[in-house]
UniProtKB/Swiss-Prot annotation:
GO terms for cellular component: cytoplasm; pericentriolar material. Disruption phenotype: Knockdown of the expression into neural stem cells of the mouse neocortex causes a neuronal migration defect. Belongs to the CEP85 family. This is Centrosomal protein of 85 kDa-like. GO terms for biological process: neuron migration. Plays an essential role in neuronal cell migration. Its main location: cytoplasm. The keyword Transmembrane does not apply. Keywords: Coiled coil, Cytoplasm, Cytoskeleton, Phosphoprotein. It is found in: Cytoplasm, Cytoskeleton, Microtubule organizing center, Centrosome. Residues 442-644 form a coiled coil. The lineage of its organism: Eukaryota, Metazoa, Chordata, Craniata, Vertebrata. PANTHER family: CENTROSOMAL PROTEIN OF 85 KDA, CENTROSOMAL PROTEIN OF 85 KDA-LIKE.
Amino acid sequence: MWGRFLAPEAGGRDSPSGARSFPAGSDYSSAWLPGNESLWQATAVPSNHRNNHLRRHSITSDSGDTGIGTSCSDSVEDHSTSSGTLSFKPSRSLVTLPTAHVMPSNSSASVSKHRESLTPDGSKWSTSLMQTLGDHSRGERDSSLDMKDFRPLRKWSSLSKLTAPDTRNHSGIAYPQELRNSLEMTGKGKPFMSHLRTFGPSCLHDSMELLKLEDKEINKKRSSTLDCKYKFESCNKEDVRVSSSALRRQTLDMTYSALPESKPIVTGSETFESPKYLMLGQQAVGGVPIQPSVRTQMWLTEQLRTNPLEGRTTDDSYSLAPWQQPQTEEFQQGSETPMQVLTGSSRQSYSPPGFQDFSKWESVLKIKEGLLRQKEIVIDRQKQQINHLHERIRDNELRAQHAMLGHYVNCEDSYVSNLQPQYESSSGQSLFTEQPLSHPHQEELEQKLASTEKEVLQLNEFLKQRISQFSEEKKKLEEKLKTRDRYISSLKKKCQKESEQNKEKQRRIETLEKYLADLPTLDDVQSQSLQLQVLEEKNKNLQETLIDTEKQLEEIKKQCQDKEVQLLCQKKKEKELVTSVQSLQQKVEKCLEDGIRLPMLDAKQLQSENDNLREQNATASKIIESQQDEINRMILEIQSMQGKLCEEKLTARSTVEELGRKEGSLQRLTEALLENQRQMGETYSLLDQGHEAEQSRPQTIHSKWPLFDLTVIDQLFKEMSYCLFDLKALCSILNQRAQGKEPNLSLLLGIRSMNCSAEETENDHSPETLTKKLSDVCQLRRDIDELRTTISDRYAQDMGDNCVTQ
């Protein structure tokens, strides 16, 4: 970066030579300080003196997480290389004015320095300046070793150390020690800076033309690369040991080394140096404190260095290198699917019916990582916009410097050749002469500087606001991530419960299927029912046979008992016979003993007795045989009687049923008889009344009654005679049925004889006929009473039989 001309107060009396000096701070290179007596040239540094120190210690976690909550070791990349030989031959001229030439560097390296300086209030400033020094002619590019591929978010920490100023600048140019001593001597007062500000404006015209051409070429060759990786740099307590307790606080410095603005393009026309920082307020030129305006400007430059965007345009800041485009496309393709899953289709992927393997939860976590990376890319782009604004500020500063340097024209090499030996001889004195610059031009530059400072302050405030917004968004995203993790864990639990429930349901289904498989079908049920009917019929048949066999067994038992009785009787007879035979044998023995004494008559008697006994025995055997035959005959008779008994039982059952029907008919008949009795009572009362009337007035009836009344009486008697005949027939039928006889069919069917019809045709109303009919009616009442008594007796007998059977 171009060194900024500082404008202290005019009046450089402390410097004897009257020349202005540049403080060897963060924005100034020693190339601006030419010698007084001889031409200074950039000496080439040998290849063995190149500082190419790479100190890289990174332990990245390959667990697949987003890097949040993990920390990696320090990653300090120090690339300080120099290559090629610098040849600078200043043009000679008669004008003896010092010139400030900007020498292009041929080195191509990516310089990343992390330095830390303490502010006066004790806070730590951790800044990261990534600069690129490249060959302008070749346009070589050297990228960091960490930018080879896309990786998830990592935490990087680098220790910024308080280091002393190095004796070698980052472009690899070594300057004489005398020049540095002269710088220290010339920086002891303010007039040196004012002399340099009012230095002749015509000396640097040629060099500024070269710078403009080189800037155009630089703007053509700008490109950017994209690497989605953060480096979280923090301070380590072991490396930074400060005596004061206030200096022990550590701050987290996030340097986005993976973003495009943190990887500047290597060009040979610009020399961006990363000087060593000192504490603001303690920087001095030769031990003298810097003015507040200078301190403000230096502080602004330090703020610009925290997140620099070096050598970028708006279009180039979002462009990708050719080798990174396919990786970016793959990353976008890989992150589109997670976005769809988590936004729209993630609710469908949680449907419980399938209940897939739990390995898919890992894919969901990877999807979340992809979302976080996309969020980080958006944040990076917003930070790129902020850095683009910083770039515009730097461009404005460059324009201001170019305008200031444009006034230094007609600067010849002869003056420089005359100045260099004078500068080398006068080591303790400053040999610059200050020429007065036009006051209005100086005021205009100061106004521009103030406006740029104001813009820088505004941009810094805006940057702080955006950083705070980004931090809040990051916290929100972390909270959302935690809630999503909790939600995922709850979903896992739910899935486990549902899987267990499904297993239980599956077990139940299997048991039900087994049960249904064991159940018989309709054909089986029908066949079993048929078998059951067949078995029932067989069972009935077997029961009947069993009953028959039991009956036969009882009969056989009875026969056996009878036979046993007979056998006992026969045994008794046999015993009697045996006793008689024994007695006879004894008698025979006695007879044999006394045979001499027995006469012949006794022998004949014994012979006859034996014959009788034999006859008796034969008759007894015949009797026994006859008795056995009788027993057999009786057994047959008993069997026949048993069959008859069964038949009689069946007939008895049928008769009982018939009797039940007859009882029902008898009940109906009794009801009819009661009704007839009531009617007969009424007729009797009417007949009694008529008989009394006839007896009282037997003669005057025919004379007094009119013809109409006689016909009515005839009709009444006719109907009464019909009722009397029917009642007689009914009483006779009931009596016959009660006695168990067959009823008279003519009476039952109501067939009347001719005599009855002849009697009915008679219209004799004589007292004899009336008395006869009255006697018939009385007889009918008696018959009805008898019938009632028989029916009641029969009913009482039936009730008694029913009670006995029950």
